[in-house]
Each structure stands twice: as structure tokens, then as C-alpha cells.
Curated annotation (Swiss-Prot):
The modification Phosphoserine is found at residues 252, 262, 268, 272, 276, 500, 629. It is a peripheral membrane protein. This is Amphiphysin. InterPro entries: AH/BAR_dom_sf, Amphiphysin, Amphiphysin_1, Amphiphysin_I_SH3, BAR_dom, SH3-like_dom_sf, SH3_domain. GO terms for biological process: learning; synaptic vesicle endocytosis. The modification Phosphothreonine is found at residues 260, 280. Residues 261-274 have a biased composition (Pro residues). Residues 24-240 form the BAR domain. Residues 541-562 have a biased composition (Basic and acidic residues). SUPFAM superfamilies: BAR/IMD domain-like, SH3-domain.
Length: 686
């Protein structure tokens, strides 16, 4: 008996040695290896199928454990409700019955899932271990087959052939081949069939789970509705004991998670003692309040850092009242709310820069809608003045169609023949070289002397385009007729150069002043006299950057003519005289006028290059990093062109829609490069 066991053990050891030797030779490349690529693919699919089935079994067991936990939790909940239920309350027995039936439903649902799905899954996975063992055994038989084949080939190729050994090797080879074929054929049939059967198994399993769950929820919904009706009737029975949650949010809803980083806090620099004469710091205002975000859409923009502490030297100069004017009156400005959003730091002035000329008009800065009074009207009591609060639209056509400017309101009156005669006598035959031509407009010639001028009802407003500035006024002196808009540009030519036939010759002067441009000539109505403005020449002022306007002129007059006009205005006739400082060199007038035309044309082209629906420009004060694809990435100092927002909710939350000016000038694509950005990160530009 011991000999038999020893023989079997020795035989198994010999097989293991032969297999190990064969594998080593195959790894070293000294012996060929039989391979079946199709069978190897079947083995890979089998391993994948086994892993998927094992995971499904694990998750189903977890699902059943959760059902068991829900059963216990539901039972404890209904028991606690039954314990707190008072005997005199409505539906005490119904509550107990609902709890018991719910427990039965949970138990039935759990048991059916175990019987219909879990046991089936266990049976499905039970066939994998046997097939796995057969695959491993086939691999061993394949090594034995290769070893017997190599041994037979070695004996047949040797020089000294031993027929007995060769015949014995052939028998061993045929035996190994037969055993390998048995395992190989069976697995070649079973593995593809098992791989295909997984689809039907998954279908049956999840159909069973879904049908059982649907039936369970349908039955338990009836019990839940029953419990709801009991609670409703109990509430009606005790209506005077209603319960309300105090302090509960009314608009609590899911918000869009948009984590937008706030800009980094910038440390406020300590002001030096020499920065301000009184060493007083301006109080730091708190950060702007984060706007309310629209519900269920987008949170408001991030909060910018606190403003830097600045010395009191940066006080606005417009708050200082000038008491040194001859006609001191408070200035009345009518501005729109949008203009108050951006504070402009005005240029500081000294007493040496003040102009004490009573004929100098108070002119509002370019771009504002302020309505000021002419100097001639300042002789009246200040409480009798009128202020125009209407915003004047820009005149269309010509080189001025892209600018808007507030026009001085003035009253025109007719001049008598005597005034005309005095004005013509005061005209010099030759302009003085040291007195540069200054332009002014006043309706003096070509008017019917029997009619009085009415107050203009409409005014065409044009801002200055260059340093010298140009202002074109139009007024129709007809009775009750609307004022037609007229625009003209001044071109002052030196003596000896030709002019257009539209210029008026004065007392045999050889110099003619031509009107270079007239985009919209005056179209007077029937019976209305034609207005030909005269010219008043004033000495040039050295005040640079005061923002005064020049009016269109067709001739030149000395300063004495302006004084005569002022004397007539004080006698009861109202007239507007506007002066503008000009360079001392009269030869520079023509290049300045040409530059004004070029500047206005370029400004018109710039307006046409703005995106559709353009509202205004803003400058970024802080860096902003976009948290979503529909937001802009902004750096400090970027200029953004604001366009109307598609969503009122985003606008109410403090977001604006716009496109970076650099992207717009480069790509001209508003739909691709526009995006949202926080309004409180920017400041508005005029």
C-alpha cells in the first residue's frame, strides 16, 4: 500500500518537474509554445464576466441590507407616533394599523427580492469556479502536450535512434494530446455560451427588481395617503393649535454654485505728512454691499476690496465757490443720474487764471447736459432766469454727428438801423497782426427791422472737436415757427487767399472768409427773414483748457462792436455773444480748423465701430477671474464696452454684460467674446 502511494507521489513530482522544465525552455525561447488566441480571448471575457457578476452580487446584498434597515426604521417611526398619540385624538387605531401594514410590506418586499434575484444571482455565479478550474487544468495539459511533443521530436532527430524509446514517446504524446483535446473542446463550447448568457441574466434580474419595487411603492403609497388623511383630519380637529416656524426663509431655494473668488485685499498705504497740509485722512468708506442674487440662477458678484485711505487734498474743486466774479451767481447744472456716477477731478485754478471779462459766457464742460446762462442774461435778477433741463440730441449729418454739447440759452432781439450803422463804421479795413481773429455770432444783418426775435424753441448742440472748439448756433426769428437745425464750420483765411462767394464783403476788405462746411443749411419758412450773423472780435485769452466754445463767424469786427452790442443788451434787448481763446498767431487758424474736421470725422468712425446696443464704457478697478464659461476674465485697467443684458435677473443681481474693448477692436465678434462681469468691480467712464 505504501509502495502504491510512493509511486503516485513520485509520478506527480515527475510531472511537476517536466512542466517546470518546459516552461523555462519556453521562456528562454529554446522551445516553441502552442497558443490559441481565440481561446485566450474567451478566457479574458470569462474573467470580466466573473468580476461583473461578483460586484452585482455585492451591491444587491447591500441593497437588501438597506431595505431591512428601512423596515426597522419605519417600524420604529410608526411606533413612536403611536406612543405620542393621545387617546382622544382622531385616528389613533388607524395610525397603528398603517404602521403594521407598512412593516408587512417591507418584509414581503425584502423576501421576494431575496428569492427572485439574490438566489438567481448566486446560482449564476456558482458555475464560474468549476469553469475556472477547468481552464487552469487545460493550461497544465497544454504544457504536458508541448513537453511530450518536444521529447518525441528530440528522439526522432537524434543520430542514434532507439525504436523502443521512440515508440514509448509516441504513446505518451498521443495520450497527452487526447487529454488536452477533451478539455479544450469542452471549454471552446462553454465559454462563448456563458459570455452570451449574461445579457439575458441581467434583463431577468433587473426586471424582477424593478417590478417588485414598483409594486411595493404602489402599495405603500396607499398607506401613506391614508396616514396623510388622518393627519389632515386631526389638524382640522385642532385648528386653533396651528404650528408655524418663525424665522424660516421665504425664498430659500437651491442656488447655483458659482464660486467666484474675491479680489485680493490691497493694503492701504500710510499717507505721508507732506501729502496734506492738515494731515487729516479721509474716512474709509465700507465695501459696497453684495447685491442680492436672483433665486435659483446666479449669485451676486464678489465684493471688491476696501478703498485706499487718501488724504484730504483730493477735494472736488467744484465745491469751492468763486467770489471774485463780477456777476457772482450760483451756477445751476441739470445733469442726468448717469453723469453723477463718475466723478471728474477738475483742473485747479488760481486767481491769476480768472477772467473778469463780463462778456465771457459760463460754459458747461463738454459731454455734460448742464444748461448755463449767457453773460448778457446775468444782468437780470438770478431768480428770474430760466433753465433748460432737456437733453439736447446731436445734430445729424456732417462731421458733427457724433458729438453732443449743451447749448447756451439766450434771447435774440432785432437791431435798429442805427446799430447796424455803428457796427459797420467800427469795422477796420485791415486786421491787426497782434490781434488774433476771435469768432462770435450775433444776428445783425439781413433781418426785418419791424419784427422782434422770439425765444428759440430748439437748439442744435455741437461739442468742440479740437483745442479751439467750435459751437454752432441756430435760431429762427419767425413768429411761433419751429427752429431748423443749422450747422457750419469756421475757416479763417489770411488776407490774399480766395474765399467762397457765400462770404460777406465788409467796407471793401480784400479778405473773404469762406464757410468750409455747411452740412445742414437753414431752411427758412415762407415769410421768415434770413439770419446772417455778424462777428465780434475779442482779444485772445491765455486760459488753456477752460472748455469755452467758439461760434461760427462769417466776418471780423473789432472789440468796440462787442461793447456796443453789450450796451444795447442792457437797454432791454437780449443778445448772446460767445468768445473763445485763440492762439496768438493768426496763421494757425486754418490748420486748427482742418484738425477739427479730421478729429470729428475720426470720432464719427469710432462711433460706428462700437458694438450694437452699446450703452457706455467702464474701467475695471480690480482683477476678476471668471468662475463660469459665460463670464469675462478681467485685469485691472481693462476697458469694457457695456451692452444690454439678456437676463433681468443677472442685471438685478449686480452683473453687467459687455465685451472687452481690445477683443472688440481685434475680432468684431460680440456673440463670442461678450460675457458677464460684476458692476461693483468697475467704474463708469464718460
Amino acid at each position: 500500500m505504501a509502495d502504491i502511494k510512493t509511486g503516485i507521489f513520485a509520478k506527480n513530482v515527475q510531472k511537476r518537474l517536466n512542466r517546470a522544465q518546459e516552461k523555462v525552455l519556453q521562456k528562454l525561447g529554446k522551445a516553441d509554445e502552442t497558443k490559441d488566441e481565440q481561446f485566450e480571448e474567451y478566457v479574458q471575457n470569462f474573467k470580466r464576466q466573473e468580476a461583473e457578476g461578483t460586484r452585482l452580487q455585492r451591491e444587491l446584498r447591500g441593497y437588501l441590507a438597506a431595505i431591512k434597515g428601512m423596515q426597522e426604521a419605519s417600524m420604529k417611526l410608526t411606533e413612536s407616533l403611536h406612543e405620542v398619540y393621545e387617546p382622544d385624538w382622531y385616528g389613533r387605531e388607524d395610525v397603528k394599523m398603517v404602521g403594521e401594514k407598512c412593516d408587512v410590506l417591507w418584509e414581503d418586499f425584502h423576501q421576494k427580492l431575496v428569492d427572485g434575484s439574490l438566489l438567481t444571482l448566486d446560482t449564476y455565479l456558482g458555475q464560474f469556479p468549476d469553469i475556472k478550474n477547468r481552464i487552469a487544468k487545460r493550461s497544465r495539459k497544454l504544457v504536458d502536450y508541448d513537453s511530450a511533443r518536444h521529447h518525441l521530436e528530440a528522439l526522432q532527430s537524434s543520430k542514434r535512434k532507439d525504436e523502443s524509446r521512440i515508440s514509448k514517446a509516441e504513446e505518451e504524446f498521443q495520450k497527452a494530446q487526447k487529454v488536452f483535446e477533451e478539455f479544450n473542446v469542452d471549454l471552446q463550447e462553454e465559454l462563448p455560451s456563458l459570455w452570451s448568457s449574461r445579457v439575458g441574466f441581467y434583463v431577468n434580474t433587473f426586471k424582477n427588481v424593478s417590478s417588485l419595487e414598483a409594486k411595493f411603492h404602489k402599495e405603500i403609497a396607499v398607506l401613506c395617503h391614508k396616514l396623510y388623511e388622518v393627519m389632515t383630519k386631526l389638524g382640522d380637529q385642532h385648528a386653533d393649535k396651528a404650528f408655524s416656524i418663525q424665522g424660516a426663509p421665504s425664498d430659500s431655494g437651491p442656488l447655483r454654485i458659482a464660486k467666484t473668488p474675491s479680489p485680493p485685499e490691497e493694503p492701504s498705504p500710510l499717507p505721508s505728512p507732506t501729502a496734506s497740509p492738515n494731515h487729516t485722512l479721509a474716512p474709509a468708506s465700507p465695501a459696497p454691499v453684495r447685491p442680492r442674487s436672483p433665486s435659483q440662477t446666479r449669485k451676486g458678484p464678489p465684493v471688491p476690496p476696501l478703498p485706499k485711505v487718501t488724504p484730504t487734498k483730493e477735494l472736488k474743486q467744484e465745491n469751492i465757490i468763486n467770489f471774485f466774479e463780477d456777476n457772482f451767481v450760483p451756477e445751476i447744472n441739470v445733469t442726468t443720474p448717469s453723469q453723477n456716477e463718475v466723478l471728474e477731478v477738475k483742473k485747479e485754478e488760481t486767481l491769476l487764471d480768472l477772467d473778469f471779462d463780463p462778456f465771457k459766457p459760463d460754459v458747461a464742460p463738454a459731454g455734460s447736459a448742464a444748461a448755463t446762462h449767457s453773460p448778457m442774461s446775468q444782468t437780470l435778477p438770478w431768480d428770474l432766469w430760466t433753465t433748460s433741463t432737456d437733453l439736447v440730441q446731436p445734430a445729424s449729418g456732417g462731421s458733427f454727428n457724433d458729438f453732443t454739447q449743451a447749448q447756451d440759452t439766450s434771447l435774440f432781439t432785432m437791431q435798429t438801423d442805427q446799430n447796424m450803422a455803428e457796427t459797420e463804421q467800427a469795422l477796420p479795413t485791415e486786421p491787426q497782426a497782434e490781434e488774433p481773429p476771435a469768432t462770435a455770432a450775433a444776428p445783425t444783418a439781413g433781418l426785418d427791422l419791424g419784427l422782434e426775435m422770439e425765444e428759440p424753441k430748439e437748439e442744435a448742440v455741437i461739442p468742440p472737436a479740437t483745442d479751439t472748439g467750435e459751437t454752432v448756433e441756430t435760431a429762427v426769428p419767425t413768429e411761433g415757427a419751429p427752429v431748423e437745425e443749422a450747422e457750419a464750420e469756421k475757416a479763417a483765411l489770411p488776407a490774399g487767399e480766395g474765399g467762397s462767394p457765400e462770404g460777406a464783403k465788409i467796407d471793401g476788405e480784400s479778405t473773404e472768409l469762406a464757410i468750409s462746411e455747411s452740412p445742414q443749411p437753414v431752411e427758412p419758412e415762407a415769410g421768415a427773414p434770413q439770419v446772417i450773423p455778424s462777428v465780434v472780435i475779442e482779444p485772445a485769452s491765455n486760459h488753456e483748457g477752460e472748455g469755452e466754445h467758439q461760434e461760427t463767424a462769417t466776418g471780423t469786427e473789432p472789440r468796440e462792436a462787442a461793447e456796443d452790442v453789450a450796451a444795447q443788451g442792457s437797454a432791454g434787448e437780449k443778445q448772446e455773444v460767445a468768445t473763445e481763446p485763440t492762439p496768438l498767431d493768426s496763421q494757425a487758424t486754418l490748420p486748427a480748423s482742418a484738425g477739427a474736421v479730421d478729429a470729428s470725422l475720426s470720432a464719427g468712425d469710432a462711433t460706428q465701430e462700437l458694438p450694437p446696443g452699446f450703452l457706455y464704457k467702464v474701467e475695471t478697478l480690480h482683477d476678476f477671474e471668471a468662475a463660469n464659461s459665460d463670464e469675462l476674465n478681467l485685469q485691472r485697467g481693462d476697458v469694457v464696452l457695456v451692452v444690454p443684458s439678456d437676463s433681468e435677473a443677472d442685471q438685478d443681481a449686480g452683473w453687467l454684460v459687455g465685451v472687452k474693448e481690445s477683443d472688440w477692436l481685434q475680432y468684431r465678434d460680440l456673440a463670442t467674446y461678450k460675457g458677464l462681469f460684476p458692476e461693483n468691480f468697475t467704474r463708469r467712464l464718460e
